[in-house]
Amino acid sequence: MANQTPIPVIVNGAAGKMGRETIKAVVQAADMTLMGAVDTNPEYQGKDAGEVAGLNEPTEVPITDQLEPILAYVAGERHLQPGVMVDFTHPDAVYDNVRSAIAYGIRPVVGTTGLSSKQIEQLADFAEKASTGCLIIPNFSIGMVLLQQAAIAASQYFDHVEIIELHHNQKADAPSGTAIQTAQMLAEMGKTFNQPAVKETEKLPGARGSLAGEGIRIHSVRLPGLIAHQEVIFGAPGQIYTLRHDTSDRTAYMPGVLLAIRKVLQLKSLVYGLEKIL
């Protein structure tokens, strides 16, 4: 990297918890430079991104609520590598954010969950036509990728499985993108799980969770005090096999975020999932 210019990075959702951690990680990465910080919260407009993130030194990058001028600015810096936008915003905003970034030739790295399957298909088509890399990653934790791989291995030997995901009460969407992705991975094994032993009746709608395909149920918990946690519970006569991953601090995601920023520059289309770039 010594002979290359640094990767210009825009952090969208800069004042959020993941945005702040990303700013710190990008500033500390020798091969990256923070070029823009965007957040719609009026409390942080004009404030230095480094100050908001808790860095000791200012970044001289003010937070703005206008994404497109930042995209245009970074796209116009031709002496730099192609820009990357890291998006930790809101399910209602992320689709338009990604389309705007791709339109400017900026590579999106998306950690915001809540995109529908149809929206992901549309973004994949848009990215492919633009020959622009895009990464959508429900969970940047390498430990979570290992849990998912272990779950795939276990699914060959167990016919009953349910997923419980637990997050902080500021998370807007449920179930989590990671839980949905885990269920999809298991569904791709080509078997139907959880054949009922009896005819089930829900006394309260949703008591048995949401069906994610092939009989796999997902249960969501939202409480203050939690960050991000997931259990995949397999059952068979006489035994229970539980896989669990706990995030105790958001710094756990930063190796995955930095890896995604570097890898997205090598892509010409949309890729879904951290496991695809490890």
Swiss-Prot record:
Alphabetized UniProt keyword annotations: Amino-acid biosynthesis, Cytoplasm, Diaminopimelate biosynthesis, Lysine biosynthesis, NAD, NADP, Oxidoreductase
Binding positions for (S)-2,3,4,5-tetrahydrodipicolinate per the UniProt entry: H168, G177, T178
Pathway: Amino-acid biosynthesis; L-lysine biosynthesis via DAP pathway; (S)-tetrahydrodipicolinate from L-aspartate: step 4/4
Residue positions of the active site: H167, K171
Catalytic activity: (S)-2,3,4,5-tetrahydrodipicolinate + NAD(+) + H2O = (2S,4S)-4-hydroxy-2,3,4,5-tetrahydrodipicolinate + NADH + H(+); (S)-2,3,4,5-tetrahydrodipicolinate + NADP(+) + H2O = (2S,4S)-4-hydroxy-2,3,4,5-tetrahydrodipicolinate + NADPH + H(+)
Family affiliation: Belongs to the DapB family.
The protein, known as: 4-hydroxy-tetrahydrodipicolinate reductase
Origin species: Mastigocladus laminosus (Fischerella sp.)
